Amino acid sequence: MTAGAQVIANSGHDDMIHDAVLDYYGRRLATCSSDRTIKIFEIEGESQRLVETLKGHDGAVWSVAWAHPKYGNILASAGYDGKVLIWREQAGSWQRIFDFALHKASVNIVSWSPHEAGCLLACASSDGNVSVLEFKDNSWEHNIFHAHGLGVNSVSWAPATTPGSIVSSNPGPGSTGNRRFVTGGSDNLLKIWTFDPATNGYKLEREPLAGHTDWVRDVAWSPTVLQKSYIASASQDKTVRIWTSDAANPGEWKCKVLNFDAAVWRVSWSLSGNVLAASSDNNKVTLWKENLKGEWENVKTIEE
């Protein structure tokens, strides 16, 4: 973590940094800022080196995301200008390989699917729409659809494997390459979307998950593929909700509420999916774990 902190401290950005993401191997860090640029750093132990500054957005850049390395050195960025830009590094040189500009308002976040599902990028916009870009056969295709009336703040993909299939002797069809994701909106709702091969588009899997009383700022689908699915949602209403679904009843979601003393902006799962980090308006990051009784406990608080 020290190297990451050093990079941010000496970022070279001229304005606020909105996102900082390490690549799959932890050797590169991409940052983005209100100064309209993206910066790429090489990380070597405790040291870091700025190797590239990418320019192309006409406003603040909110989000950056690395594709899985099986698809090459590909980075996506999204910003206030309503654009999603795809960048690729080849032979040490970064180039912009695709511009997506069909959103009519800020694109707030971009998220790559698990690589087993394909090279898919979900983009959430303040115009109320979600777009899914797919890179195949050396070209980009897209799906765009209306998701939340007051704007979409967040999107997170489900694991490619359904819960229970790893421990089941008969995982059944469709157990890998799952194309499902959850979105969170300014309508206070979460919605789960699934790919429908019949229409070649995405459809609402079930009724929206309701309970938050203010904007849903972030959603995070746990990468765990054991017996349950977990989705965490962070809200302006000073709560995090943890939604769980059992492999036996995949359409049924139960909810536990974690109360905070400030609005919660981001939630993030550990790689194993058993620890949840939440960051809130009071400059605190809290870590949560589920105990044997199924209750969520605050196991650590980090204050800056």
Swiss-Prot record:
WD repeat residue numbers: 12-51, 56-97, 102-143, 147-203, 211-253, 259-298
Alphabetical list of InterPro entries matching this protein: Sec13/Seh1_fam, WD40/YVTN_repeat-like_dom_sf, WD40_repeat_dom_sf, WD40_rpt
GO molecular function, one term: structural molecule activity
GO annotations of cellular component type: COPII vesicle coat; endoplasmic reticulum membrane; GATOR2 complex; nuclear pore outer ring
Name by which UniProt lists this protein: Protein transport protein sec13
The gene coding this protein: nup-20
Disulfide pattern: none
Species lineage: Eukaryota, Fungi, Dikarya, Ascomycota, Pezizomycotina
Family membership noted in the UniProt record: Belongs to the WD repeat SEC13 family.
GO biological process: COPII-coated vesicle budding; ERAD pathway; mRNA transport; nuclear pore localization; positive regulation of DNA-templated transcription; positive regulation of ER to Golgi vesicle-mediated transport; positive regulation of protein exit from endoplasmic reticulum; positive regulation of TOR signaling
Pfam family, one: WD40
Membrane topology category: Peripheral membrane protein
Subunit structure: The COPII coat is composed of at least 5 proteins: the sec23/24 complex, the sec13/31 complex, and the protein vtr-7/sar1. Component of the nuclear pore complex (NPC). NPC constitutes the exclusive means of nucleocytoplasmic transport. NPCs allow the passive diffusion of ions and small molecules and the active, nuclear transport receptor-mediated bidirectional transport of macromolecules such as proteins, RNAs, ribonucleoparticles (RNPs), and ribosomal subunits across the nuclear envelope. Due to its 8-fold rotational symmetry, all subunits are present with 8 copies or multiples thereof.
Subcellular location, record wording: Cytoplasmic vesicle, COPII-coated vesicle membrane; Endoplasmic reticulum membrane; Nucleus, Nuclear pore complex
